[in-house]
Amino acid sequence: MLRSLVSLVAVALFAALPAPPAHAQAAKKLVRIHTAGPNDVNVDNTMLAVQFADYINAHSDTVEAKVFPASQLGQSREVIEAMRLGSGASATTGGPAEYASFVKRLGVLGLPFLWKSYDHASAVLDGPVGRELEQDMEKAGFKVLAWSVSWGYRNVVTAKKEVKQASDLKGLKIRTIPTKVFVAAINAMGANATPMNFGEIYTSLQSGVLDGYEHTAATTLSFKFNEVACCIALTRHLMDPTFLVFSLAEWKKFTPKEQEVMTTAARAGADTVRSMAPAREAEALAAVKKAGMKVNEIDTGPLQKAAVAAQDELAKDFGAESLLAKIRAQ
């Protein structure tokens, strides 16, 4: 009898307790966003990641997004490997080159002198070429949510010699990233591509081992290369698109409504980054001029013609001849 009375009292007390708020009944699903970029929204990939996360956090009651900049979750290669298996990071922002070992045809997006403008790149990536590559990515275990562009074309920067015309590049030892595309791009311009680790650029310019390197104006200032280099020739030979990629295994764990919010978030973030690209590039070029560097516009027509053969050869290697034809035609 006493035991029954105690049970009845306990049930009554429990029933009288206030119900927990809806948000406390189920923890939010966490989206972990990897980017190799620093914790600085003045960097394109970091800006894309932050815009994506902020939109999700403002528009979803069931999903929380958090950015992990500066490779906090690991180096990009290992992060991407884990994403294929549905572990570690949920998504990344970065360049297609990071995924090219999984989807070879992505290499076509990094060909020299491929992009006529930021608008050209955006139109191509929003069209049939982008859709084909998205299908390739899904087969490899990844979901592309949005494409964007880098903040700045890569140009040739020299230590002592001022490059005023295409022929001035002939024979110059120019540091490149040690990949086939970058080496082919520099050699096609008549310079001598010199593959080298990024950390060796400064001292190699000082010592004369290098005549120059190729990169964006923003990078030149960030790493103080203006202290050992004099001039920038606006070759605009490469511009890497960027994209926001989700683990396909992870993506399937979200409801259609949650997926819709994240897709909208990615596209809104990508649009913001795209819209800022021309101004950010102009700001960086103005800053290097202010720092005392000479910036020369040059006729890139001869360089573009010389790069056609390299484009053809590389596209064949990537199995992307049809994609290259579509990009050229657009």
Regions flagged by a language model, labelled:
Residues 7-16:
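Bacterial N-terminal signal peptides
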Residues 25-120, 129, 135-330:
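N-terminal secretory/targeting leader peptides
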